[in-house]
Amino acid sequence: MRRILFNSSNTVVLAHRGLWGKYAGIPDMPENSRGSLQIANDQCMDGVELDVKLTSDGVPVLLHDYNLGRTTTVWQQHPGVKYDPLTNQGVNPSILVTPWSQVSQLFLLTPDRRTTTGYHVPRVDELFTYYKQRQLRTPMVFDIKDAKTVRAVNSAANKVFGAASASYVAAKVNATLYTSRSAYQADGDGMVGIPVFTTNMLGKINVRQTIGAWLSTGEAMEINVKQLGGQLQSDADFVRERDVRVGVFQAIPDGPRASEFYKNNGECCYKLSDLFYGKDTADNRGSLDYIERVEAFGLITTDDPKTAIAYLRARGKHD
């Protein structure tokens, strides 16, 4: 975990949603599955970033969307038909109103959604137990959107890993949720917090002040500068000048059509231009050349980590 958190001459790469699908060389491997964590470990990824949501009864599970239709067999539990992201029709209940007793019965779909896999939606506590029993080594970073989920994942990590939690588990959290490291630590005392800054936060918080309130430990931050000289550029430079690792999300489309991304309810789709805020006029984060050569980000979260690592190695930026 220290390799992820602290700055060095090497750039570190996180496998987004684990190592899954075509990026793993296993087309049927589902995202955010126990298998995607195992494969990332087996293929020696620097780390993984996994998404967490809470069931209606407070069980933290791996899931990217707030709804179950895109990635699971939830239509088999309800009257209706399999969810179609293109039409936004079919069975697609929210995870927030679905108890673990129902979620536990669901299977994950293959990335192309054509076939059911043998993988269930993973509980985070059971994933930690699996990790420990199998003696996995790949650090786990969790993308967490609310304080209740931070507390739930932190509790699960402490129960399985104890005082060593911070060696295995970290949480990415929006800087609007926790505007200081001390505020985060009140909920996430066992796992390191990585604050995430995006341009749409500029109208909600004082970004530079918030960065200052997270700087004390010198641990990594994600600052999503979309274009050279764009919004957040001076903030990313401010952090780099203090020898703190600055991360970015590589925006690789995951939708069924070119340049499109699934929405967080599973519906298709949006384009990066739909998320422009204020003075944004471009989003170049899909380009490794922009990420490494232009902006020199030190931490990359990407669906295609093997390509990123090969790119970095060719430039002497990865072991």
Where on the chain are the PLM-derived regions?
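Phosphate-group recognition and catalysis centered on beta-loop-alpha active-site segments
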Residues: M1-D319
